[in-house]
């Protein structure tokens, strides 16, 4: 296959990886089950290769052109503000980004006008949410175990992803506000989509046929990020 016609797709390691592999499999693009130590993973389609990267790096690879396409969550995408196209919701990875606090904690104000400390992996989204509500907060960026931050005195509130809510309850936290509905989306490099439009559209049609629409796709706050699929 002519290298100019090949598609390189970045997949996020972690919670979205297996659902993404399954989604591509249903679309007839199966990853090599035993790639060994190869960084580029071949697939059943000779014109498509995959690479696996950290979730935060998917949009970086796609925006830079190191990958033509990628699969990522709208939480990471909105946090990064990457300049990429979002042509398709993929119908998996549904959850929500929420603000939460201890059940006994006053909400939405702190006693005596105290500035609330908020622990999160999403500092930009958290700050914007509270700024829109006119609530000054101090953002504390952490990379893991966000739910224990109030228990340990690191923060008063948290902003984190929630699926069932069981982890919040186990740590004595109550979901207060939904900030963003999250789901997996296909993202595309702008230049690549122009140069390889036919390949992009062919793959998108295959994925669209097996993807179930859900919330978490392109948002009104990000106009112009959706690439229409040509009929």
Question: Language-model features: where?
Answer:
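Domain-level signature for soluble enzymes in the chorismate/prephenate branch of the shikimate pathway
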Residues: 1-231
């Amino acid at each position: 296959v002519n290298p100019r016609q090949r598609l390189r797709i970045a997949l996020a390691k972690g919670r979205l990886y297996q659902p993404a592999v399954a989604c591509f499999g249903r679309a007839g693009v199966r990853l090599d089950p035993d790639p060994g130590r190869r960084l580029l993973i071949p697939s059943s389609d000779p014109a498509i290769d995959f690479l696996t990267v950290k979730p935060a790096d998917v949009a970086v690879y796609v925006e830079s052109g190191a990958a033509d396409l990628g699969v990522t969550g709208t939480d990471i995408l909105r946090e990064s503000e990457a300049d990429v196209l979002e042509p398709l919701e993929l119908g998996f990875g549904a959850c929500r980004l929420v603000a939460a606090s201890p059940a006994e904690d006053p909400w939405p104000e702190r006693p005596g006008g105290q500035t609330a400390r908020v622990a999160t992996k999403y500092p930009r989204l958290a700050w914007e949410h509270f700024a829109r509500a006119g609530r000054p907060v101090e953002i504390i960026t952490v990379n893991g175990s966000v739910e224990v931050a109030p228990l340990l005195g690191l923060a008063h509130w948290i902003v984190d992803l929630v699926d069932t809510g069981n982890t919040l309850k186990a740590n004595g936290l109550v979901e207060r506000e939904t900030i963003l509905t999250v789901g997996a989306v296909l993202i595309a490099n702008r230049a690549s989509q122009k140069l390889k439009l036919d390949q992009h559209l062919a793959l998108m049609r295959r994925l669209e046929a097996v993807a179930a629409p859900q919330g978490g796709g392109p948002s009104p706050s990000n106009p112009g990020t959706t690439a229409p699929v040509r009929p």
